[in-house]
UniProtKB/Swiss-Prot annotation:
Chain residues that bind Mg(2+): 271, 280
Keyword annotations: ATP-binding, Magnesium, Manganese, Metal-binding, Nucleotide-binding, Nucleotidyltransferase, Transferase
Keyword presence, Transport: no
Taxonomy of the source species: Bacteria, Pseudomonadati, Pseudomonadota, Betaproteobacteria, Burkholderiales
Name of the encoding gene: ydiU
A GO term for molecular function: magnesium ion binding
NCBIfam families: PRK00029.1
Cofactor: Mg(2+); Mn(2+)
EC class name: transferase
Entry function: Nucleotidyltransferase involved in the post-translational modification of proteins. It can catalyze the addition of adenosine monophosphate (AMP) or uridine monophosphate (UMP) to a protein, resulting in modifications known as AMPylation and UMPylation.
Catalytic activity: L-seryl-[protein] + ATP = 3-O-(5'-adenylyl)-L-seryl-[protein] + diphosphate; L-threonyl-[protein] + ATP = 3-O-(5'-adenylyl)-L-threonyl-[protein] + diphosphate; L-tyrosyl-[protein] + ATP = O-(5'-adenylyl)-L-tyrosyl-[protein] + diphosphate; L-histidyl-[protein] + UTP = N(tele)-(5'-uridylyl)-L-histidyl-[protein] + diphosphate
Record-annotated active site: 270
Entry protein name: Protein nucleotidyltransferase YdiU
Amino acid sequence: MSFSPSIAGLSGPLSALSDALTTAPESAFASLGSVFLTRLPAAPLSAPYVVGFSAETAALLGLEPGIENDPAFAELFSGNATREWPAEALPYASVYSGHQFGVWAGQLGDGRALGLGEVEHGGRRFELQLKGAGRTPYSRMGDGRAVLRSSIREYLCSEAMHHLGIPTTRALCVIGSDQPVRRETVETAAVVTRVAPSFVRFGHFEHFYSNDRTDALRALADHVIERFYPHCREADDPYLALLNEAVISTADLMVEWQAVGFCHGVMNTDNMSILGLTIDYGPFGFMDGFDAGYICNHSDSQGRYAYRMQPQIAYWNLFCLAQGLLPLLGEKHEESVRGDKAIEDAQRVLGGFKDRFAPALERRMRAKLGLETERAGDDALANRLFEVMHANRADFTLTFRNLARVSKHDASGDAAVRDLFLDRAAFDAWVNDYRARLSEETREDAARAIAMNRVNPKFVLRNHLAETAIRRAKEKDFSEVERLAAVLRRPFDEQPEHEAYAGLPPDWASSLEVSCSS
């Protein structure tokens, strides 16, 4: 059922979009029913206005640039327009559980996010979700709001990660308001519109497992299989095949994160996507100076989610997912041995994580070093580089980008990367071995540099860049948000006119801290 566009004051493309959102197909997540979600309108947001808008993401939904200038756009994506939607088509908050910082946290759920529904365009379907849309039954002690700074960070990073080639939720827009929100200080409220094929998390499976709701667990798994992994239905054990897909996509995602120095910050099981997407951008960070133990989240005092721990934590989280799926596994076995066989099968599939992750990361590192062929000492060469980078806190992004200038013939191109290291002798020792390795390659320097610059970005969302955009946005100057977003859409291009966005962070950036408070 759809609502009358005239009731909500919408017309044209926004009316059509709203009509689609309130008419859920049978295969949509929202059609799973009240066991999985609670419907409610978004909380009112006073005098909403557009802070940032992604024309690329809008195109995925069939929206044209300029639509953000329609006053009704801010009303819809602030959630205000949903207050006039019929009860059966209201936005929804889903329930899930999970492990937070390694401890079972019990029931969680969308505490400040509301699903709007699904849109189909160009043969693809996307679910839309408003983060910061107000309290839900799962808000616990929270106020259900998001603040401007965290919303801008998520908007920018969602789009930046996509253009780095990393699986991620997308961001359509940020809607701001002067409505006050109290955190450590008084800030202003904002809503970011997330766009993804699905927002199903590991924690959804954990929830129904922990509540002994095998019927709901099966319905959820069937939904994911039918929508995203239909080939699993042909497997001997479809649910084991689903687990295998999660292992593969999660391992691949960890390769992508590690390869660009990205640290998520809150890898709780409720923040892990069943599709292997990067979701829930909170206290994330791209490393500046390389530190294997880099902790981007000020709240992570034990370093559980440090950079070097991310693959291990992803593996641990997959164990939690496997446990959640156990009641569905092993149906092909006789009842007397089903439980033991299910565990054996799950352990075997989980073992595939290392088999997938390790060689994929090795291949990525060879590409980052510009090596076409494989040699026995390549891993050691890469590891030695990281050791020297760690000892010197050499900038992660600039080190790999500038390695493209190193010549296999002489030291004429070394300076750009050498200057990033305080211990020049240590770097020289490494680069001489690197040059010797390059001499074994048939590809010439120019061709190698082009290839390296396709995998080593020049531009990433450094914290100080986001902070500058946020500070200006707080003064109602949103130009830097869009300027930075435009730069990040071309991370591998030289963009000489934007050289300042690729430089080392200023001294004041060292005092920046991000935490779970958002």
